[in-house]
């Protein structure tokens, strides 16, 4: 996929925006930015949120995992989203376990916020010339911490 994207981007004019549809995996977004892509959209944050997967800067978390059963902390302490500022990971796990519709909504909200923060960090790293370092550091931590 990387080779196809790189080839396709080489055919596009530099002065026009470049858009990748359906790209939501953080590694793919970072690769796309490195190739010159400007815009992305994908259902991944909400689809994964509906299924109990939370994106964090330390990797994916499966909120149904028993280790969250009595956790009083939010899904991600550094996140300022409504979910993380009002609900514990243990409560979210409870919502998923009883089939309460609020759980998927709250986790989707967190995931959307994660991707907004992620894209903001990418933009900042591009503007200050540290994108390659940001990408390497992010990938090292995110995929090492993947706990799905």
Whereabouts are the PLM-identified features?
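Glycine-rich phosphate/ribose-binding loops and adjacent secondary-structure elements
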Residues: 1-75
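C-terminal extensions of enzymes
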Residues: 76-148
């Amino acid at each position: 996929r990387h080779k196809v994207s790189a080839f396709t981007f080489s055919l596009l004019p530099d002065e026009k925006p470049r858009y990748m549809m359906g790209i939501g995996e953080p590694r793919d977004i970072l690769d796309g930015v490195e190739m010159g892509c400007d815009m992305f959209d994908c259902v991944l944050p909400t689809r994964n949120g509906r299924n109990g997967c939370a994106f964090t800067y330390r990797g994916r978390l499966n909120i149904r995992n028993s280790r969250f059963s009595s956790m009083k902390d939010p899904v991600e302490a550094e996140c300022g989203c409504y979910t993380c500022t009002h609900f514990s990971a243990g409560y979210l796990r409870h919502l998923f376990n009883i089939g309460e519709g609020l759980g998927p909504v709250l986790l989707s909200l967190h995931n959307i916020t994660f991707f907004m923060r992620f894209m903001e960090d990418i933009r900042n790293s591009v503007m200050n010339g540290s994108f390659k370092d940001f990408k390497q550091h992010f990938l090292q931590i995110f995929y090492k911490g993947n706990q799905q």
